[in-house]
């Protein structure tokens, strides 16, 4: 809702209300489609994370990706802090992982390689091939990418 309000406000500010309303309709449509598909599938236990040099950041309920995951009927695995250890990730029991990355496709491949190591091979999501990439721009202040982000998360949750 916050993303949609922001887009509508920007549309008013720049006198582009019709364009803004079209973007908002697209976001709502993506959300409605995802919710309908979520009703037909089991809820997932999800972690959205970003590998940093020496730590792992977790994107929980309070961020856009977490909000989308909840709206699509799944659960974000919660931690007390925004950063977790490799051991906490290994023991989390997530059946779906979204890995956030910055940059181009090669950066995405590098981020994905962080989870595809023997240390994490027992995580259900890794075992079952349910690890998906999300570009950073799509999960933090996504605005015009919000509908795309909803579709990417929905596909990861329910189509693989």
Language-model segment annotations:
Residues 1-2, 16-26, 53, 57-61, ...:
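Extracytoplasmic/periplasmic, Sec-exported soluble proteins
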Residues 86-99:
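Proline-aspartate-enriched helix->loop->beta-strand connector
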Residues 70-80:
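A local structural motif
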Residues 2-5, 12, 21, 38, ...:
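Structured C-terminal subdomain patch of bacterial secreted/periplasmic proteins
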Residues 10, 15-17, 58-59, 69, ...:
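A residue-level marker of the well-folded mature domains of exported/periplasmic proteins
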Residues 82-86, 117:
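Structural motif corresponding to alpha-helix initiation and N-cap regions
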Residues 19-72:
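Basic- and aromatic-lined ligand-binding clefts that recognize polyanionic substrates
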């Amino acid at each position: 809702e916050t993303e949609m309000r922001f887009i509508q406000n920007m549309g008013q500010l720049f006198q582009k209300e019709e364009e803004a309303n079209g973007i908002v309709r697209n976001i709502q449509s993506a959300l409605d489609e995802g919710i309908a598909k979520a009703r037909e599938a089991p809820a997932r236990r999800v972690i959205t994370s970003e590998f940093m040099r020496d730590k792992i950041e977790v994107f929980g309920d309070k961020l856009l990706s977490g909000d989308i995951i909840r709206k699509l009927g799944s659960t974000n695995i919660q931690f007390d802090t925004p950063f977790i250890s490799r051991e906490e990730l290994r023991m989390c029991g997530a059946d779906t992982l979204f890995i956030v990355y910055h940059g181009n496709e090669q950066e995405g491949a590098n981020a994905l390689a962080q989870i595809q190591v023997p240390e994490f091979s027992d995580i259900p999501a890794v075992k079952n091939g349910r690890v998906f990439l999300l570009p950073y721009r799509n999960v933090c202040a996504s605005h015009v990418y919000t509908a795309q982000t909803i579709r990417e998360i929905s596909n990861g949750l329910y189509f693989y």
